[in-house]
Regions:
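Flavin-dependent oxidoreductases
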Residues: 189-220
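Conserved N-terminal glycine-rich FAD pyrophosphate-binding loop of Rossmann-like flavoproteins
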Residues: 52-68
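FAD/FMN-dependent oxidoreductases across multiple families
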Residues: 213, 223, 232-304, 310
Length: 420
């Protein structure tokens, strides 16, 4: 569980660490990195500007690329138990007719499972052994390794020096400006959607999507229930979820009991979470004053179901590489991490952007053409670039060793032989 901890106590705990690490943002990427570093004996300071953890949560589908992070944390069994495999994926026409069903388990069986899990359950798994965090605190300036902590209202809180400062504060990151990343390359689709939860009526291993004319409906299994996403152009959502859900029902011939219950769940929720369908990426993750991680570095559209998984992978890669880092080699290890991981994340993000071009288009002719393509295009073909990433995960230990050896070869520190 997340444990509210005074900032002074976190700072005191890391006083003798070989690397003093600050993580700004207690989302999935920030928590994953903090917990992995703690498992390795460090005491990273973790802060979040929110006064309490109040994120309402949504559903996630995680590729097998995340599994090693849970193994390293000693919670892989808990992770498996908290989710449910999404074994099959079904695609429906804009009128609701089933067009095709593909096996996800056959697609990924060599590597693992495509696991459906709620965000809340995922955070419970990641923090199962306790996770100190200071809420109501963020950073508004960094200079020569010293971070200035402030309250959400801007009131000063403290200052402290660190060897590594990491911005993991989400897709609308403020740490981008603090660390000098500049404006991100962003895709603003003009679409949003509501997230709700529904009972699973009969098929807990099936994910379904209906790409309609001016709307999108998806249902995704998590443990004991379905995560529902119902979205459309922002202007069409102006009258609220119940009205939009009603308009969707009027445009579809065949929903069936499962999708009908999903639409009803959105309409009945008094305050469903609204998810804006935008993305963002920065050209560099390693910056003069720190590092960006997760959505702060590359925030995804949810069209390929890979964003959270890549955030976890990036955090795991960084944590494993920091095992072999000290202050003398830190800069080279960070550069090596970015060289290895950023192209993978950007390839996955580009795949999400490609699918978005299919999804976020209106008109019956467009819907018909899209369905013609999707009827012939298997999930294997649609997610081809992502499957390549699953099959070719880099070795962080080898990359870190190479970076460390290169540092010592270029400029051996006193008392160190470059050939040892």
């Amino acid at each position: 569980m997340l444990t509210e901890t005074p900032l002074a106590a976190q700072l005191a705990a890391q006083r003798d660490d070989r690397l003093r690490v600050l993580i700004v943002g207690a989302g999935i990427a920030g928590i994953t990195l903090a917990q992995l570093l703690r498992r390795d004996g460090l005491h990273p300071v973790l802060v979040d500007r929110m006064p309490v953890m109040e994120h309402p949560g949504y559903m996630l589908a995680l590729m097998p690329t995340v599994d090693q992070a849970f193994v390293d944390l000693g919670v892989h069994t808990e992770y498996r138990d908290a989710g449910t495999p999404m074994a099959r994926y079904a695609f429906r026409s804009h009128r609701g007719r089933l067009l095709r069903t593909d096996s996800m388990s056959e697609l990924l069986s060599v590597y693992g499972e495509y696991n459906g899990i709620s965000r809340g359950a995922l955070i419970e798994v990641l923090t199962a052994h306790g996770c100190p965090v200071t809420f109501g605190t963020t950073v508004d300036a960094v200079a020569e390794g010293t971070a200035r902590f402030v309250r959400p209202d801007g009131a000063p809180a403290s200052e402290a020096a660190f060897d590594l400062i990491i911005g993991a504060d989400g897709i609308r990151s403020r740490m981008r400006d603090v660390l000098g990343a500049g404006a991100p390359d962003a895709v603003e689709t003009g679409w949003s959607g509501w997230v709700a939860w529904a009972e699973d009526l009969g098929d807990p291993a099936l994910g379904e999507e209906l790409w309609g004319d001016g709307f999108f409906l998806g249902v995704y299994p998590v443990k004991d229930r379905l995560g529902v996403f119902l979205g459309g152009p922002d202007a069409a959502l102006a009258d609220g979820p119940a009205a939009f859900a009603g308009s969707v029902r009027n445009r579809v011939d065949e929903l069936g009991p499962r999708l009908s219950a999903a639409v009803a769940a959105v309409a009945a929720d008094p305050d469903p979470y609204l998810w804006r369908l935008d993305d963002a990426r920065v050209p560099r993750w390693v910056l003069p004053h720190g590092v960006l991680l997760g959505d702060a570095a590359a925030g995804f559209l949810p069209t390929a179901g890979i964003g959270a998984g890549m955030a976890i992978e990036s955090a795991w890669m960084l944590a494993r590489m920091l095992r072999q880092a000290d202050r003398a080699v830190l800069a080279d290890v960070l550069e090596a991490w970015e060289r290895a991981e950023r192209p993978r994340v950007e390839a996955a993000q580009s795949n999400s952007r490609m699918l978005a071009k299919l999804m976020f288009r209106r008109g019956r002719l467009v819907a018909w053409l899209r369905e013609t393509v999707m009827r012939m295009l298997s999930v294997r073909a649609a997610l081809g670039p992502i499957l390549k990433l699953v099959a070719s995960r880099p070795d962080p230990d080898a990359i870190a060793r190479e970076a460390r050896n290169a540092t010592f070869t270029a400029a051996p520190p006193a008392g160190h032989r470059a050939d040892t």
